[in-house]
């Protein structure tokens, strides 16, 4: 793209590359008139239109203009040419808070307390303006030259006007490890409550050096999030533990509010000095945990060693193998299986099973159960590339909420997609809450 030293719009001299993502790059730049250092986010117009990001960009601009707070990265101006869109933003010199955690392994409660107070101040301000961030995580928290926190990246933010008539937001946004259980359920959620949950996960990560909710795969992590299953390590002060359990309450209606957080003893007074331990050198286990916080993924099959949901009649699940696109984390996780599909259902296990059996019969598919409890479904005739075959697993998040995952294991991919789109998806519409990957 633009090389170092290039003059942009006769106003900015472009410098080094600060970072890049799927849809753009961020460069350091200098205002030629004021000599002020800025960061310029550059996006290709055609690519934005092609992938349907125009609404998200409009929202980001609107949001950033609504918020002006010392702990929020400021948007100075937006410029455009025929081919490019340029966001001129405050340049934050200190880098990501995320990098600090990765380098040290964890922070003391005293340091984490300072950052958490600044985070809550910024989030509370946003909420007072009807703005919800929806993607709060350490990577979106920057530090200035004075070690003060700055919240960035409003690309997923939602305005209060985006709510439906029920007063709730309905878009699944955010990064899996930091997302609230009600967001996962995709049944509508209060943006303020979901941001509070994410703040709690961030606080835990800062002091622990690892994520509160972990599992061998995404489904198990989601299950733990839904049930609020986490434990605080021994070096957490008692008051911090008490606050975290109130913040990461899986029930949004009883979850602590920002006002109550600000009134809590730990938030107002900080940790007890005699409870604070010195930061330790990263050991092998902590390094592994930090890798999880950083989002480093194992190359191993994401479903390896998963204990399947114990449903009486797993045969029913075989029929699910024909769906496409339900990935609750479709925005964030790169799928390791090309022909994998997931969907959610709010029906009971018995209803799902019955429906799957009906669909299998209608589509002339053979259903059989494997020894490890995974259901295998296959065609009765050999296709262009052998017999079409699928593995199916059902994961119980709650008794009335299930995630069904399907994976093609053999046969022709084109035949699989055709069967999925023309046969399976239409046949399962009565039990599907959402195909993940669909808008």
UniProtKB/Swiss-Prot annotation:
InterPro entries: KA1/Ssp2_C (IPR028375), Kinase-like_dom_sf (IPR011009), NAF/FISL_domain (IPR018451), NAF_dom (IPR004041), Prot_kinase_dom (IPR000719), Protein_kinase_ATP_BS (IPR017441), Ser/Thr_kinase_AS (IPR008271). It catalyses: L-seryl-[protein] + ATP = O-phospho-L-seryl-[protein] + ADP + H(+); L-threonyl-[protein] + ATP = O-phospho-L-threonyl-[protein] + ADP + H(+). Keywords: ATP-binding, Kinase, Manganese, Nucleotide-binding, Serine/threonine-protein kinase, Transferase. Residues 12-267 form the Protein kinase domain. Pfam families: NAF, Pkinase. Its EC number is 2.7.11.1. The keyword ATP-binding applies. It comes from the Eukaryota. ATP binds at residues 18-26, 41. One of its GO terms (molecular function) is protein serine/threonine kinase activity. It is an enzyme of class 2 (transferase). The keyword Methyltransferase does not apply. Residues 338-367 are annotated as: PPI. Residues 153-182 are annotated as: Activation loop. Residues 298-333 form the NAF domain. One of its GO terms (biological process) is signal transduction. The active site is at residue 135. Its cofactor is Mn(2+). The activation loop within the kinase domain is the target of phosphorylation/activation by upstream protein kinases. The PPI motif mediates the interaction with the ABI (abscisic acid-insensitive) phosphatases. CIPK serine-threonine protein kinases interact with CBL proteins. Binding of a CBL protein to the regulatory NAF domain of CIPK protein lead to the activation of the kinase in a calcium-dependent manner. Belongs to the protein kinase superfamily. CAMK Ser/Thr protein kinase family. SNF1 subfamily. This is CBL-interacting protein kinase 14. It comes from Oryza sativa subsp. japonica. The gene is CIPK14.
